[in-house]
Amino acid sequence: MLVSCATAREDATAKAPASAASHAAAHAAALDAAIAGDWRDPKNASRDIYRHPRETLTFFAVTPDQKVVEITPGGGGWYTEILGPYLRERGVYTAAMVDPMAAAEGRSRDGQQKYLDDLKARLAARPAQFDRVALRLFAPKQPSFADAGSIDTVLTFRNVHNWVAGGTAELYFKAFYDALKPGGTLGVVEHRAKPGTDLDAMKKSGYLTEELVIRLATDAGFRLDAKSKANANPKDTADHKNGVWTLPPTNRHDPEDAATYRAIGESDRMTLRFVKPAQ
């Protein structure tokens, strides 16, 4: 009988790693299928060489059964095209968008309305992939992204420089912390400035130091869990005349310099994973 019990324990121990490996393989296959989907805008897919969605989302440990909030999806829903289908069956993907009526009247409000309308149209065009995408509108000076403690992962791609420039970054990181479950993940990708760059230069260039982003997160209560080189670009010197917008995809430069900046590619980016400590 003792031998039988020991054997059962050994079998259970052996099955646990195998089961974990099987789940990881299934998640990877589902992510690959979402990245390869023919519903993606070809222009978006062509930028995978710069944005590395597989490596990035794997590093952030996003799985198909999670509740995930992406903050102000860029590029007409660049990551929405991947995360919407990936999370459709077992998880929940929420695109958090600025409420146009909470934006300043005029160009700002008009721009946010167009941004929202364009994303809605994109989602409506492919219901088989995007019919379960949730939208949450928020006020930029009072951001709130979910019920407290309800989200597994919050993701933000190339947004933090906007909040730093607008003086609202601390509000956003606190809202991320509030939305996440204890043990939840905050994934941040951001244009990376050279260490020691002063705040005014960061605001003008769109590049932020890792030190600043880490401080914003840890001041809000997060713990830095890991860094990834997935979106690093050593060709980017981060000192361009028109800041990060000099580079693709914005390409704010003289036409004769196009080849130079195309050879550099998109910006050098930090990829940081933070965790909300378990209570």
Predicted regions and their residues:
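C-terminal motif of bacterial Sec signal peptides marking the signal peptidase cleavage site
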Residues: 2-4
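Bacterial signal peptide processing site
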Residues: 6-8
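Conserved class I S-adenosyl-L-methionine
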Residues: 64-75, 83
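A short glycine-rich, Lys/Arg-flanked "PGG" loop and its adjoining helix->strand segment in the class I
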Residues: 84-85, 169-182
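Conserved beta-strand signature within the Rossmann-like core of class I S-adenosyl-L-methionine
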Residues: 94-96, 183-192
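A short, conserved alpha-helix within the catalytic core of class I
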Residues: 140, 162-175
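C-terminal lobe and adjacent flexible extensions of AdoMet/dcAdoMet transferase-like proteins
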Residues: 220, 259-279
